[in-house]
């Protein structure tokens, strides 16, 4: 059963697109949609086994995998060179890899802080820079960075909030500095998404993850497909005049978080979009 994309077949025919963190969650879902739309895919991440499983799901044809620590400049260069040796070009890049853990600022060690900043901000910089220098500076392309909402602070994840703020500012800056090369760069800012990553959070966070939908105007969690669709749009020719934006896909949570004066009534009028036949609801939300 193939991915049920809302975009036209063959949209990315002849294009090579890199997806970091492509072995699970949002990266896996995005990879499936891009493959359905004709892209040649390069999946890059830390764990080869995860990448290989997704490659098997997609079919071996036109799929390349490369395991690398994206916080390491030498490994990033090797990964980009590997993709170019395989595919000969890089038309699109999805910086989806990341990682964090819940903790209050007073409890975060320097090593923990540095690890989260490196996972979510430094890796985005390194991969984007090397893709730009090795291909896009002379050939153009599109980059989408997957982030998180940080504008109102991120209590319980201050390290992640700081990193994501820097990641979005990098998007804004690069969209100006690299525009002359025909490179567009944008961010997608997911809200609370029912992705497999939720199951990695400790049990003490489960009630918050389940109950947060009460604060979301659409009164539900988002789906992986709803994030993938935003990424696909920003990579596509339809977004040819779109650069330097942070596109929120959060069911209205950000705007509602600015005010405590209005309580959205409970409802079930927001119907989710799910085009991914292999998607499963995280256990924590069952």
For the regions a protein language model found, what residue spans apply to each?
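Alpha-helical segment proximal to the catalytic Tyr-Lys
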Residues: 133, 176-180, 240
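Short, small/polar-rich loop/turn modules that mediate ligand/substrate recognition or access, typified
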Residues: 94, 179, 184, 242-244
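Conserved glycine-rich cofactor-binding loop
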Residues: 16, 23-25
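C-terminal substrate-recognition "lid" of short-chain dehydrogenase/reductases
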Residues: 125, 220-249, 254
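Catalytic loop of short-chain dehydrogenase/reductase
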Residues: 144-166, 171-180, 193, 253
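A glycine/serine/threonine-rich, flexible loop-to-helix segment
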Residues: 5, 180, 190-215, 256-286
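Substrate-binding pocket helix/loop in short-chain dehydrogenase/reductase
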Residues: 104-105, 112-117, 212
């Amino acid at each position: 059963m193939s991915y049920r994309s809302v975009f036209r077949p063959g949209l990315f025919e002849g294009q090579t697109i890199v997806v970091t963190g492509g072995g699970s969650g949002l990266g896996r879902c995005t990879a499936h949609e891009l493959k359905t739309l004709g892209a040649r895919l390069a999946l890059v991440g830390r764990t080869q086994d995860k990448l290989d499983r997704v490659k098997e799901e997609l079919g071996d044809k036109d799929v390349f995998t490369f395991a690398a620590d994206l916080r390491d400049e030498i490994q990033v260069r090797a990964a980009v060179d590997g993709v170019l040796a395989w595919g000969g070009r890089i038309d699109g890049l999805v910086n989806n890899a990341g990682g964090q853990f819940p903790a209050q600022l007073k409890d975060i060690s320097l090593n923990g802080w540095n690890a989260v900043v490196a996972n979510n901000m430094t890796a985005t910089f390194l991969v984007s820079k090397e893709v730009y220098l090795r291909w896009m500076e002379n050939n153009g392309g599109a980059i989408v960075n997957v982030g998180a909402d940080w504008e109102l602070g991120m209590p319980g994840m201050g390290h992640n909030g700081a990193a994501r703020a820097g990641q979005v500012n990098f998007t804004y800056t690069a969209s100006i500095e690299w525009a002359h090369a025909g490179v567009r760069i944008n961010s997608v800012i997911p809200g609370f998404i029912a992705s497999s990553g939720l199951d990695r959070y400790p049990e003490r966070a489960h009630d918050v993850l389940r109950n947060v939908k009460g604060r979301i105007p659409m009164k539900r969690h988002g789906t992986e497909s709803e994030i993938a669709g935003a990424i696909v749009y920003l990579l596509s020719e339809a977004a040819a005049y779109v650069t330097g934006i942070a596109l929120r896909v959060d069911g209205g949570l950000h705007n509602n978080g600015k005010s405590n004066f209005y309580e959205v009534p409970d409802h079930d009028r927001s119907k989710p979009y799910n085009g991914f036949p292999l998607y499963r609801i995280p256990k924590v939300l069952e």
